[in-house]
């Protein structure tokens, strides 16, 4: 295809490219005239038969729209032809900036060429990886009686046994289970749904606002306390969010935690049929917990190996996006500890890994299917701080969310494929050592 434009290189820096295109006014006028004739041959206007509208009338009525249409098409055609002939391969981002607008089909006369810049960033070539040539350590935890006992101790803490206090002088303290009756009002008016009888909560368990718990702490059975309580604007219960509410609280009963020394008694309090069932549950839970840790360590070892394979250039625009994502994900204290250089290095590392994983997916025809997306959302929607229905709605309506989740799913699918194909060196390690290794990641 013959070129209708002149192009010159403005910038070639690493992966960045900038080219200046010039399209002559004569060519543009011809394209506009051809389009106007095409419209005139088919347009219907009052007082004219089809195809009998004068070109000047069409020019007056449609000229500006046709010029915009032609300029857009010329830019697209010139850029596409140049990119195809140049063999640039995959492009990460591209941007067009018109630097000189021509006078075409204008009442102010004709003249001037179309001049615009095409800026883009290349996707670098990354090497292929054969997962079968990678060796990974597959650690299996040696679970001992000490580990099982520790897990059962966690059950004691998680499911404490409470008994009613028989002392009239007993005051509510952190760790106690209390039963309260309460009423709430706002500006002297009772809040609908803002009262309850027999409400049960464990002090210090995070079920109540801390200020509320502080007011209850120290009360005795039968005590009534009235106080004002302020709720933050983002409080999960809309009824109270952003309000200072008058509260009246009566402490009905106090139950204190009682240590359960006998395994049979603990098993029954936790809902197991017998102590043996509880021990079996503890053992299987530990196996699952340590299998997760082992898998995470293998993934880290895989990523560390992949980092050595490609240390080449990465697209700055993608690194910039990843840096912004890191800043959104991490707490201010973590960002301060990393520093700007640390954030940049981590962003570059993530982008390189992403490029390599994408290459593996292309080489091995690994694709994301609808059922993969569905399974991911079902398992991870709580991580987005929303209900399943809300995340699904966001997935349907937000392209950015769709791309993010699709990327996470593809990464997980490719990593699982690579781990499955890699050679494994099985190692038995004490459970405590495996836990320490996992916590050091």
UniProtKB/Swiss-Prot annotation:
Keyword Isomerase part of the UniProt annotation: yes
Pfam families given in the database record: FKBP_C (PF00254), Trigger_C (PF05698), Trigger_N (PF05697)
One cellular component term from this protein's GO annotations in UniProt: cytoplasm
SUPFAM superfamilies linked: FKBP-like (SSF54534), Triger factor/SurA peptide-binding domain-like (SSF109998), Trigger factor ribosome-binding domain (SSF102735)
Catalysed transformations (reactions): [protein]-peptidylproline (omega=180) = [protein]-peptidylproline (omega=0)
Gene3D superfamilies, A to Z: 3.10.50.40, Trigger factor ribosome-binding domain (3.30.70.1050), Trigger factor, C-terminal domain (1.10.3120.10)
Keywords, ordered alphabetically: Cell cycle, Cell division, Chaperone, Cytoplasm, Isomerase, Rotamase
Primary site of residence: cytoplasm
Entry coiled-coil feature ranges: none
EC number: 5.2.1.8
A single GO BP: protein folding
An MF annotation (GO) of this entry: peptidyl-prolyl cis-trans isomerase activity
Domain of life of the source: Bacteria
UniProt key word Cell division: yes
Domain (PPIase FKBP-type): residue spans on this chain: 175-260
Cellular compartment(s): Cytoplasm
Entry's free-text remark on domains: Consists of 3 domains; the N-terminus binds the ribosome, the middle domain has PPIase activity, while the C-terminus has intrinsic chaperone activity on its own.
The protein's role, per its UniProt record: Involved in protein export. Acts as a chaperone by maintaining the newly synthesized protein in an open conformation. Functions as a peptidyl-prolyl cis-trans isomerase.
Similarity comment text for this entry: Belongs to the FKBP-type PPIase family. Tig subfamily.
The protein's name in its UniProt record: Trigger factor
Organism expressing this protein natively: Anaplasma marginale (strain St. Maries)
Lineage: Bacteria, Pseudomonadati, Pseudomonadota, Alphaproteobacteria, Rickettsiales
Designated gene of the protein: tig
């Amino acid at each position: 295809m013959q070129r209708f434009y002149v192009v010159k290189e403005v910038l070639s820096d690493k992966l960045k490219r900038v080219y200046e295109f010039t399209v002559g006014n004569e060519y543009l006028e011809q394209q506009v005239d051809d389009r106007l004739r095409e419209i005139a041959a088919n347009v219907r206007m009052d007082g004219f038969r089809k195809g009998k509208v004068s070109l000047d009338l069409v020019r007056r009525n449609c000229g500006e729209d046709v010029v915009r249409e032609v300029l857009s098409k010329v830019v697209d055609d010139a850029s596409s032809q140049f990119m195809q002939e140049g063999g640039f391969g995959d492009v990460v981002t591209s941007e067009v900036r018109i630097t000189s607008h021509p006078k075409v089909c204008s009442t102010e006369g004709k003249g001037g060429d179309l001049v615009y810049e095409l800026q883009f960033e290349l996707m670098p070539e990354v090497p292929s990886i054969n997962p079968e040539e990678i060796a990974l350590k597959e650690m299996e935890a040696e679970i001992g009686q000490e580990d099982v006992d520790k897990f059962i101790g966690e059950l004691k803490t998680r499911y404490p046994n409470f008994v009613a206090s028989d002392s009239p002088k007993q005051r509510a303290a952190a760790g106690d289970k209390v039963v309260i009756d309460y009423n709430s009002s706002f500006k002297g008016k009772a809040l609908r749904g803002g009262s309850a009888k027999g409400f049960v909560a464990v002090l210090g368990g995070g079920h109540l606002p801390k200020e509320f718990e502080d007011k209850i702490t120290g009360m005795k059975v039968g005590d009534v306390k009235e106080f004002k309580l302020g709720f933050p604007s983002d409080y999960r219960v809309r009824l109270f969010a952003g309000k200072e509410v008058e509260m009246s609280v009566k402490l009905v009963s106090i139950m204190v935690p009682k240590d359960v020394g006998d395994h049979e008694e603990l098993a029954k309090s936790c809902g197991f049929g017998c102590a043996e069932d509880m021990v079996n549950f503890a053992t299987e839970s530990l196996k699952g917990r340590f299998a997760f840790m082992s898998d995470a360590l293998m993934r880290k070892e895989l990523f560390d190996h992949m980092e050595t394979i490609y240390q080449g250039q990465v697209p700055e625009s993608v690194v910039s996006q990843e840096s912004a994502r890191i800043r959104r994900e991490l707490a201010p204290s973590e960002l301060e500890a990393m520093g700007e250089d640390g954030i940049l290095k981590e962003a570059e590392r993530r982008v390189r890994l992403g490029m390599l994983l994408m290459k593996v997916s292309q080489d091995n025809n690994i694709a994301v299917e609808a059922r993969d997306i569905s399974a991911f959302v079902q398992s991870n929607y709580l991580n987005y701080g929303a209900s399943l229905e809300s995340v699904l709605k966001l997935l349907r309506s937000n392209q950015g969310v769709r791309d993010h989740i699709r990327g996470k799913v593809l990464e997980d699918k490719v990593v699982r494929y690579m781990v499955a194909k890699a050679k494994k060196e099985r190692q038995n390690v004490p459970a405590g050592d495996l836990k320490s290794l996992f916590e050091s990641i």
